[in-house]
Regions:
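Residue-level detector of functional hotspots within protein domains
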Residues: 6, 13, 82-83, 124
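Bacterial Sec-dependent N-terminal signal peptides
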Residues: 1-22
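Carbohydrate-associated surface elements
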Residues: 144
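Conserved SGNH/GDSL esterase-like catalytic core that processes O-acyl groups on lipids
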Residues: 23-28, 34-120, 147-152
Length: 152
């Protein structure tokens, strides 16, 4: 799964680099524990944002703004937009924003009651990044599947 996300992101970023100016292209990776690198022996080198930085090299500045347990839903149990990582990502004003959020929203505390807000909250998140950088390119990563024996 992570390999597919990386390949898609790398391909899109190379296309974006054709239009890049002389400055380093800033890439903000937004997400939950998958983005953060939770459970990895060394998330600073093994998380997908760290791997993406290695693959893209010096013309890019990739930053990890993942927050373990984060939800996309603003009424979820840990709304991403209420986290420090979100504020830092907005301040970073990425040229490209990769969003991988939504898996924690399937939690029974969130989805049954708030699922109708999912699209609205996604648009609000995207609009926040557009307000920080009107020329930002937004990429939404496909969610990792939940195993069939997972309690959700």
């Amino acid at each position: 799964m992570m390999k597919n996300v990386l390949l898609i992101v790398v391909a899109a970023l190379f296309i974006a680099s054709a239009n890049a100016q002389q400055h380093r292209i800033k890439v903000a990776c937004i997400g939950n524990s998958i983005t953060y690198g939770y459970g990895l022996p060394d998330r600073t080198t093994q998380s997908y944002p760290a791997q993406l930085q290695k693959m893209l090299g010096e013309p890019y500045q990739v930053k990890n703004f993942g927050k373990s347990g984060a939800t996309l839903l603003n009424k979820g149990h840990r709304p991403y937009m209420q986290q420090d990582e979100f504020r830092r990502a907005i301040d970073f004003a990425g040229d490209i924003v990769v969003i991988h959020l939504g898996i924690n929203d399937t939690d029974p505390r969130d989805w049954p009651d708030y699922r109708d807000f999912f699209v609205k909250d996604y648009i609000e998140l995207i609009d926040s990044f557009r307000a920080a950088n009107s020329k930002v390119r937004i990429m939404i990563a496909r969610l990792a599947p939940i195993a069939d024996r997972h309690p959700r």
